[in-house]
Regions:
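Conserved N-proximal alpha/beta basic substrate-recognition cap immediately N-terminal to
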Residues: 2-91, 98
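Short glycine-enriched loops at secondary-structure junctions
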Residues: 41-44, 63-64, 172, 178-180, ...
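Protein kinase-like catalytic core scaffold
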Residues: 110, 151, 173, 223, ...
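Short, charged, surface-exposed secondary-structure boundary motifs
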Residues: 66-72, 185, 252-255
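C-terminal active-site "lid" helix and adjoining low-complexity regulatory extension at the edge
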Residues: 219-220, 229-274
Length: 274
């Protein structure tokens, strides 16, 4: 029996768990299932109920929950030898102050990334120490509300664009997100970037290769990953920026096309089960 908790994928049995905690009836259904299909926004409780009680689940969100946030992703990249911009992790402001005491300070320009948030909303290009202090003041305020942790990352000029590689089961789809404004920093569609499906196919293939390597090592099979290519030095060597488990669908052709790809990928995954 194939069990689906995904509202847009029909299986032998279908259950909606949105807006509630999973309970005994959900566990009973999972125990009877040969495979479980989970929603993209699957909460941790439902995920591990399925993970611990069924041998086959889609998607594989092990690293999403075991390596949470941008700090967790950096640890994941390090542990799996995935190339990424040089990064320092700070669990709070105090750890930053201990690292940079007195007149010692990080080199500029740099990128500050708070541990939470998406679509570039908590990522800042810092060109001056006044801007850096503003980011640190904001981090201190966030700590007071319970949100803590940030990264300081080398700024890698990448031609005002990034490559989004979306993995959906065994399918990889990639496209550039490019900014016409040479002064722009965020290469995200929500910040005004444009989709480019055709430029530099060789680089796109390299980007897909590094994503495929991470997927092979980690088990990720549903995510949008951001990759950049340095303008100087070794432009042919892609660097992983981050993993997005919730991602936009414009670059995939819209929601209808995304769900078409997803349903086909899930069916192939089910067909591959022994």
């Amino acid at each position: 029996m194939i069990l689906s908790f995904h509202p847009l994928f029909s299986a032998d049995r279908n259950i909606i768990c949105a807006g509630r905690e999973p309970g005994p009836s959900d566990l009973s259904a999972i125990l009877e299932a040969r495979a479980v299909i989970l929603p993209q926004g699957c909460p941790q409780g439902l995920y591990f109920m399925a993970r611990d009680n069924c041998p086959n689940i889609f998607p594989n969100y092990d690293v999403r929950f075991r390596y949470p946030g941008k700090i967790g992703q950096t640890r994941l990249f390090r542990e799996n030898s995935i190339p990424h911009p040089p990064t320092k992790i700070f669990k709070n402001i105090e750890s930053y102050r201990r690292c940079y005491q007195g007149t010692h300070a990080p080199s500029l320009p740099l990128v500050v990334k708070f541990d939470w948030g998406g679509e570039g909303d908590t990522v800042f290009l810092v060109k001056s120490y006044r801007e850096l202090e503003t980011c640190l003041e904001h981090a201190a305020k966030c700590e007071n509300s319970g949100q803590r942790g940030f990264l300081i990352q080398d700024y890698i000029p990448s031609g005002n664009r990034s490559l989004r590689v979306v993995v959906i089961g065994d399918c990889f789809k990639s496209y550039w997100r490019s900014c016409a404004d040479q002064n722009a920093f965020h290469a995200s569609l929500s910040k005004g970037a444009a989709v480019d499906w055709s430029s530099d196919p060789g680089l796109k293939e390299m980007g897909e290769t590094i994503v495929a390597e991470l997927c092979h090592k980690s088990g990720i099979n549903l995510a949008g990953m951001d990759v950049i290519f340095p303008e100087s030095g070794s432009p042919e060597k892609p660097l992983m920026l981050e993993i997005n488990y919730f991602f936009g669908r414009i670059g995939l052709g819209g929601s209808k096309e995304y769900y078409r790809i997803l349903r086909k990928a899930i069916k192939r995954w089910i067909g591959s089960l022994v």
